[in-house]
Amino acid sequence: NKELAISMGVEEFESLRNKIGEDLIVTDGTTLLGADDKAGIAEILTMAEIILKENRPHGNIRIAFTPDEEVGRGPDHFDVEKFHADFAYTVDGGEVDSVDYENFNAADANIQIQGLSIHPGSAKGKMINALHVAMEFHSMLPVNQNPAYTEGYEGFNHLCDLHGECEHAVMSYIIRNHDEQLFEKQKEDFRRIADYLNQKYPKDTIRLEIKDSYANMRSIIEKDMRVVDLVKKSMKDIGIHPSSHAIRGGTDGARLTYQGLPCPNLGTGGYNFHGKYEYASIQEMEKSVELLLKIVENNLS
């Protein structure tokens, strides 16, 4: 977008180095694209269209689209028994050469802070500024667990929202880690800080609520890797060198896996999700469709 001086290059987005010669779908730079996950929907429906038009042989295929995946509520009302499948895949990732079955353990933390508002002219020894307490709470969390400093298998505590005034403030965090023990330690850090501040200030200054969202599906999938092996064989059959990565996020498949439906995640050819630099490669989207068709074919044998 020349008017707004918005552009993207390989210096900031390394994935572009591998997209030379490909056709990219982008935005005007003022909004996200929505390839996450309209790309996956398009690929699944294109697969179904080809199977029906060409009358290709196939086993029983179940297709479902879940709303609210981005807020972690996609499987809330998903009926696994009614879906009636032995295994499944979410088509919700990035690189098409990746089949991912390892994701974050996830929790949400909500912190209510009750302050005491006094006229600042006579506040000495009396005022408790809830916003100051919020900043104090945040400063006591490990600095190296700020998401801006993490990568790979490193977990993080992300402050998503802070609002309020002197009398009352609210903080919202997401807590993430692939390792279950480290994940539990991060949650314990929140409880320990809340206990400390409730001793420093009047009781119930801090009210902390932590809710688990989803868990790492790796331990379940690794008990029976056939669902992954099928994808890797299909990738090789169409000339893709398969890879697997630890997802620095979550998918509906993680919760579905724990509900008895093994569900790794496949790539869509979309990149830079959740921001105005999001884009999708048409060639990778076409390759994703080819992969889905090959999975259907190989599953028959």
Q: Each PLM stretch: what is its role?
A:
Residues 36-43, 130-133, 227, 252, ...:
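Catalytic-loop motifs flanking and including active-site residues across diverse enzymes
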Residues 1-60, 287:
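Active-site metal-coordination/substrate-binding segment of hydrolases
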Residues 53, 128-147, 181-193, 229, ...:
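His/Asp/Glu-rich mid-to-C-terminal helical/loop segments that flank catalytic regions of hydrolases
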Residues 49-71, 151-152:
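Short helix-loop-beta-strand segments that form the rim/entrance of peptidase-like active sites
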Residues 7-17, 21-35, 67-195, 204-206, ...:
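Midchain, well-structured core segments that form catalytic/ion-binding scaffolds
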Residues 26-35, 240-245, 275-276:
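Short pre-catalytic strand/loop immediately N-terminal to key active-site residues, enriched for Gly-Thr
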Residues 132-149, 156-158, 205, 215-263:
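Active-site-adjacent substrate-binding region
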